[in-house]
Design a protein with these regions (language model features):
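A short, Lys/Arg-rich alpha-helix, primarily the initiator
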Residues: 1-21, 68
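Short, charged recognition helix plus adjacent turn
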Residues: 68-98
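The alpha-helix within a helix-turn-helix
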Residues: 16, 27, 56
Length: 98
């Protein structure tokens, strides 16, 4: 099973590399600290609302694009982590029918 894609991987592989944009340039042109961008790309920091709005404006995306990517990553990672516990939960409708 493939690991979920972090927003940082998405940023680097789908935006920065193909567009030839450096992390330094992104930082300078968006006002996002370079250290924050680096940490997001390495998967050591989550995307915040501030970062989302700045990246969305810069890349011409709908507000929330990066936050949705962060939430999708978080949900998939957590689901994998607690899958055995989730498998033990009986949905309420099935529990009532039993």
């Amino acid at each position: 099973m493939l690991s979920p894609v972090t927003p940082g991987e998405l940023l680097k592989e789908e935006f920065l590399v193909p567009m030839g944009i450096s992390q330094y340039r992104l930082a300078k042109e968006t006002g996002i600290p370079a250290q924050r961008i680096g940490q997001i790309i390495l998967g050591r920091r989550r995307v915040t609302a501030d970062t989302d709005l700045r990246l969305c404006r810069y890349f011409g995306l709908t507000d929330g694009y990066w936050l949705r990517a962060q939430i999708a990553f978080d949900l998939e990672a957590e689901k994998r982590r607690i899958e055995p516990e989730l498998d033990k939960i009986v949905p309420v409708q099935r529990a009532i029918a039993l």
